[in-house]
Amino acid sequence: MNKALWGGRFKESMSEQVADFNQSIEVDARLFYQDIKGSIAHVTMLEKTHIITSDEANQIINGLQGIIEDYEAGNVTFKKELEDIHLNIEKLLIEKIGPVGGKMHTARSRNDQVATDMHLYAKEMTEAIITSIKALQHVIIDLSKQHHTVIMPGYTHLQRAQPILFSHHIMTYFWMLERDKARFSEGLKRINISPLGSGALAGTTFPIDQQYTASLLEFDDVYANSIDAVSDRDYVLDIMHNINLLMMHLSRFSEEIILWCSEEFKFVTLSDAYTTGSSIMPQKKNPDMAELIRGKSGTVAGNYMGLLMTIKGLPLAYNKDLQEDKKGFFDSIDTALQSVQIFTGMVDTMEVNAAHLSNITQNDFSNATELADYLVTLGIPFRDAHEITGQLVLYAIDNNILLKDIPLAHYQGVNKDITNDIYTKLDPEHAVNRRLSDNGTSTKSVMNQIAKAEQYM
């Protein structure tokens, strides 16, 4: 095998098996643009501080830009024996412009180089995830406004509980996503710090200007400690943690959609574009996209725990274990972006079976709390009202009727002060619009909630 760029101290080259085990180019090739961006900033700084000449800097920068052109034209092949994206690019540069290309790495280690690449990539991907979350939030708001009068059963323990507005239920996910978005935005503060100039771990003897490279790369600051800069990946774990919460919320929403589009619920109908069929059962229309998103939430959880376990026992400073920070991280980023984008399209094209939803609450016992509350207004203590209502529900079940079908005379046998207005109180629309608390399910409250959500956007 060819001698490695770091091979001056070695008498023997790696075996092919060891080189293949050691390489990471198949994973970190993704950092191609970030690596060149960081190198151009570094070389620009080397020129500014007179560590290299203007002519040398121009040759290197032009060479790097030429490598980008070659790459985009499909004329670049990365080599495993060069280990990673950093050495592959450096080798390409030296081949293109000669020995002056070797000056690019002056005052820099691969340790601060890869950390810089990862910070740049993490920042870009975090911003992309935030943008994708916003798009989904817009769809949720639109869906809520479109169906703001539709009543559905609300659930606890997956049992019908109380009538609520469909829009109130759907807006729940807007606020979950809003917190997800806030976590990603807040995390940018920890990502937007430059490790460049930290060297392998101890800094450098060259008169570099780290604040200048930080500004060129649009970082807010420079790491205060060079060891910290190259040895930790907490900002990666931070993003992966946030992805886990995001995917958990999408998984919960997916689970509901899976239930809702079943024959047993029939709350919604998914577009054909987001479903699949069966190879043996012709009638099937499967919510595979929702199921995949639900399943992938487990995958990103595994990625997160994998990196957490990798880092937890590492001594300072850099260790090769940190090469394992990328595969699960990149997969989690891809999964999050794809999942949010697919989910956005699925919800945007989803049909709400409004008439069916409203009919359900007209024919169940989700209005039982209204009856208990009504009895309280007659002076009956709530615990007694709760007991009486439970007995009335049991009476209705035994007689195969609903609360609205119980004769007034029977109600008055419970309490003589009950009047005909009890039937109005039992109406689901009346029940919904009595929930006037600021965050309740009344039409007024939900429309105010939607208006508040639009302000966040």
Swiss-Prot record:
**What Enzyme Commission number(s) apply to this enzyme?**
4.3.2.1
Look up keyword Lyase and say if it applies: yes
Question: Which pathway is this protein engaged in?
Answer: Amino-acid biosynthesis; L-arginine biosynthesis; L-arginine from L-ornithine and carbamoyl phosphate: step 3/3
Which Pfam family, just one, is annotated for this protein?
A: ASL_C2
Where can this protein be found? Cytoplasm
Sorted alphabetically, the Gene Ontology BP terms of this entry are: arginine biosynthetic process via ornithine; L-arginine biosynthetic process
Q: What class of enzyme is it?
A: lyase
Q: Which reaction does it catalyse?
A: 2-(N(omega)-L-arginino)succinate = fumarate + L-arginine
- GO molecular function list: argininosuccinate lyase activity
> Which cellular component appears as one GO term in the record?
cytosol
Q: List the disulfide bonds.
A: none
Instruction: Assign the protein's first listed, main location to one coarse class.
Output: cytoplasm
What UniProt keywords apply to this chain's record, in alphabetical order? Amino-acid biosynthesis, Arginine biosynthesis, Cytoplasm, Lyase
Q: Which InterPro entries match?
A: Arg_succ_lyase_C, Argininosuccinate_lyase, Fumarase/histidase_N, Fumarate_lyase_CS, Fumarate_lyase_fam, Fumarate_lyase_N, L-Aspartase-like
Cited SUPFAM superfamilies: L-aspartase-like
Q: Which family does the UniProt entry place this protein in?
A: Belongs to the lyase 1 family. Argininosuccinate lyase subfamily.
Which HAMAP family has this protein been placed in?
Arg_succ_lyase
Name the chain's protein.
Argininosuccinate lyase
What organism is listed for this UniProt entry?
Macrococcus caseolyticus (strain JCSC5402)
